[in-house]
Amino acid sequence: MEPVTDATVYVVDDDADVREALAWLLRSRRLLSECYRSAEDFEAGVLKLPPVVRRPSCLLLDMRMTGMSGLSLFNRMLERGEIAAMPVIFLTGHADVPTAVDTVKRGAFDFCEKPFSDNALVDRIAQALA
């Protein structure tokens, strides 16, 4: 089955079960995805590429992770001006909602509170890639 778009949805979450579930969901909706277990791995694997080499994309980013947090990665991306080219959708637990709202005010595309609706998340991804 061919992907519906040539864009890539990057998933950065330190929980292997979440990464696996999101990869399955995206595959079932014919969306290309790449999963990373840490912000550091994502930064080394994707953000080191020149922007002209990268595919159109969006980023599903866990707010809290071991090592570099999703918030720290977002702040680094803001400093480098990478948010406009790669919309960020934060995945957050209930306690992080005020922080997630603040990130949207600062340039994140949106946030989804865990547990999230598959359809709502896919709709947000489609909007981010439009």
Briefly describe each language-model feature range.
Residues 37-38, 69-75:
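Acidic catalytic/metal-coordinating carboxylates
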